């Protein structure tokens, strides 16, 4: 019986021949019937793929056989089967698109000048010791935070990661430059870049949640500082860490609580919108 699984991982490391890595990764993933998205650049690799657990394990083993990727932090989650429409493996200037490839520096140890990594338990100790001096800073697209975020987090007004550079340069967050800023995102890759951009712009004490929201949820579920659901970029669209998850989102039709996204146009021209099950049923009827 097939057991669908999804893995998420990234590695920042210099890659002299991204095209060779792309061909190898495509061949490896295709050989094991995986689907998903893999981005490769001179700065490293960023991948989310899914398939049967046995095939995914073989892919992970093969990927880790390449020395620069041997310590990749692989984040596992349950899939639905056919979670991605196809396999896409591409070379891009950036493995996460901030529109600032020239600002990012990496070496064999990862991003140069990024924020200090904190495990979920270390984040709790920081908050317990520093209180209101600690600020959570959301490193995701704005719509993702509509259904889940850290308590009292700063959520920048961004539609894509390309908007972050302008947001940081606007000065609207300069009052945080003397705070302890904890950046967070889904699996950690966006905060690797975001934290380095913040540090280069004068934010003095910048951290990043190691392993992202995924690792935090594994450690604390819904008993810690995270509230709501987590948006994911596959067929599932959202996941919860327990049945105690709060519902933060609001239906764009009736205003009722929901964490349910649908691909529908709305009056703002956005296709991905929050729509509760009741409104979907009423529309269908």
Swiss-Prot record:
Any Pfam family hit: Rhodanese_C
InterPro entries in alphabetical order: Rhodanese-like_dom (IPR001763), Rhodanese-like_dom_sf (IPR036873), Rhodanese_C (IPR022111), TrhO (IPR020936), TRHO_N (IPR040503)
Main enzyme class: oxidoreductase
EC number(s) given by UniProt: 1.14.-.-
A GO term for molecular function: oxidoreductase activity, acting on paired donors, with incorporation or reduction of molecular oxygen
Catalytic activity of the protein: uridine(34) in tRNA + AH2 + O2 = 5-hydroxyuridine(34) in tRNA + A + H2O
Alphabetical list of Gene3D superfamilies matching this protein: 3.30.70.100, Rhodanese-like domain
Keyword presence, tRNA processing: yes
Residue ranges annotated for the Rhodanese domain, each copy included: 130-225
The keyword Nucleotide-binding belongs to this UniProt entry's keyword annotation: no
Secretion signal, residue range per the UniProt entry: none
The organism's place on the tree of life at top rank: Bacteria
GO BP, sorted A to Z: tRNA modification
UniProt keywords, alphabetically: Oxidoreductase, tRNA processing
PANTHER family xrefs: THIOSULFATE SULFURTRANSFERASE/RHODANESE-LIKE DOMAIN-CONTAINING PROTEIN 2, THIOSULFATE SULFURTRANSFERASE_RHODANESE-LIKE DOMAIN-CONTAINING PROTEIN 2
Role description: Catalyzes oxygen-dependent 5-hydroxyuridine (ho5U) modification at position 34 in tRNAs.
Family: Belongs to the TrhO family.
Protein's UniProt name: tRNA uridine(34) hydroxylase
Species this protein is from: Rhodococcus opacus (strain B4)
């Amino acid at each position: 019986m097939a057991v669908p699984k999804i893995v998420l991982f990234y590695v920042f490391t210099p890659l002299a021949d991204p095209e060779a890595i792309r061909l190898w990764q495509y061949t490896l993933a295709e050989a094991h019937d995986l689907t998903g998205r893999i981005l490769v650049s001179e700065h490293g690799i960023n991948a989310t793929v899914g398939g049967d657990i046995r095939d995914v394990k073989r892919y992970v083993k093969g990927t880790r056989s390449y020395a620069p990727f041997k310590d990749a932090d692989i984040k596992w989650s349950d899939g639905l089967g056919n979670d991605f429409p196809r396999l896409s493996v591409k070379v891009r200037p950036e493995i996460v698109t901030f529109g600032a490839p020239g600002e990012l520096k990496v070496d064999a140890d990862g991003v140069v000048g990024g924020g200090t990594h904190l495990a979920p338990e270390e984040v709790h100790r920081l908050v317990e010791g520093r209180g209101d001096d600690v600020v959570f800073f959301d490193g995701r697209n704005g719509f993702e935070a509509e259904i889940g975020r850290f308590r009292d987090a700063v959520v920048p007004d961004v539609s894509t990661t390309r908007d972050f550079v302008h947001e940081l340069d606007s000065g609207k967050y300069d009052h945080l430059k003397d705070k302890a800023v904890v950046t967070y995102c889904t699996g950690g890759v966006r905060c690797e870049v975001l934290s380095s951009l913040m540090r280069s712009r004068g934010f003095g004490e910048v951290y990043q949640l190691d392993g992202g929201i995924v690792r935090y949820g594994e450690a604390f579920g819904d008993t810690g500082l995270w509230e709501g659901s987590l948006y994911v970029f596959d067929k599932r669209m959202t996941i919860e860490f327990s049945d105690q998850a709060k519902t933060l989102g609001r239906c764009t039709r009736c205003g009722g609580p929901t964490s349910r996204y649908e691909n529908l146009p709305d009056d703002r021209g956005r296709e991905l919108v929050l729509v509760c099950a009741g409104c979907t049923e009423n529309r269908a009827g």
